[in-house]
Swiss-Prot record:
PANTHER family: NUCLEAR HORMONE RECEPTOR FAMILY, NUCLEAR HORMONE RECEPTOR FAMILY-RELATED. It comes from Caenorhabditis elegans. This is Nuclear hormone receptor family member nhr-96. Belongs to the nuclear hormone receptor family. Gene3D superfamilies: Erythroid Transcription Factor GATA-1, subunit A, Retinoid X Receptor. Keywords: DNA-binding, Metal-binding, Nucleus, Receptor, Transcription, Transcription regulation, Zinc, Zinc-finger. GO terms for molecular function: DNA-binding transcription factor activity; RNA polymerase II cis-regulatory region sequence-specific DNA binding; zinc ion binding. CDD domains: NR_DBD_HNF4A (cd06960). One of its GO terms (cellular component) is nucleus. Residues 4-79 bind DNA.
Amino acid sequence: MLSFGLCAVCGQVTTGKNFGVISCRSCAAFFRRAPTWSRRFPECVKASCAIFENGKFKCKKCRLKRCQEVGMDVKKIQQNRDLISTSNMFQKRVTLIFGPAHSMSTFLGRPSFLLHCEPELASHSKTIIDVSYLVDVARKIFEKDATISHKSSNYYNSLELLTLALDAFRPKDIDKKLTRLTKIGKNESLLMWEQSFLRAAEWFSNLPSFMKLEDWMKLDILKSSWLAWTRLEKRCEAADYQKSKILENGVFMCGNGSCLAIAEYEVDLSWCTNYTAEQLKYYLSPDSEGQKCIEDLIELSPSSTEVNFMILQLTLHHAGKKSQGRLLEATENIIEAQANHLHSYYVEKVKMPNYSARLAKMMKINRGIAGEMRCRREKNQIARVFDIMKVEFSDPEMFELT
């Protein structure tokens, strides 16, 4: 280490000049901090203390006085010399000269949902897809006997009955019956929606309190909540298969016994829009949403009874909140009754009287999916305003979350 003599303040070895005086780094740092002190030290009684003695600096007042006596000048203290401050100041200067960094939205003067909007591609005339036959089939499902007999002795309450119904939907020999899709087009989309709608109808038909509702209530609940039912049920199914290593990460369930890998499948939107998938990137759901939810489900590892309560709470809460009035009252009564059954399940069957933390995690997952659905509805409303889609459904409310 090069030496430039002794510090003019404390007498220690120094390496250079600071604030106009040959001084050590310690005294230089001390003098640099001195102007920022919020309190002042009282006058020293001795007024001539040894600055550095026995490895310690004794009196701050005398040390500061000595710094001033040897010629240290506060005007020579330079501010904003650290790397963070310097980079911030540089960024401010760049912004002042060139303006803020431009995103594509800022550069083109369009919000992200209009980034690729081309008026000549807008679809002012729509092709109507008739889905009334689905409602007719659902009505017939509600008129016939439930999938699982209510006289079965294998269940304790209606929540357990729903659990048996959902378990019956899933294939037994899953390794041989899963079909991996590589392309999603018109036929695949319509088939998956039909399967999901009718499966949700069959599931609801196994709930006695639901079947006691008026016909219009049952259909309204189904039409407004089947997509919520599908979203959560398929993620729970994918979580089970990923946990048991039947499916790898990034592979989702998308139909009855079918799945797709997000990184491998091709989507064909030509049947429903004139825009490309790249142009519609704003309107498409990010893949991270589904995988994050599946990871949360794997960590929680809910039982079949818990899964059915989660699905019931999500769907009925969504349907009741949307319709209000008598239907809201009916859905709240059903949820309350099933919450009591869930309590009995925890206390009597699994011997878990303190289940509040687990229930909170379940409801957190449901709130996340509810938030996704709100975002999806808003984006679909924007798409309708700008005629992004060239098809419409005969019952638009059934597909407002697609």
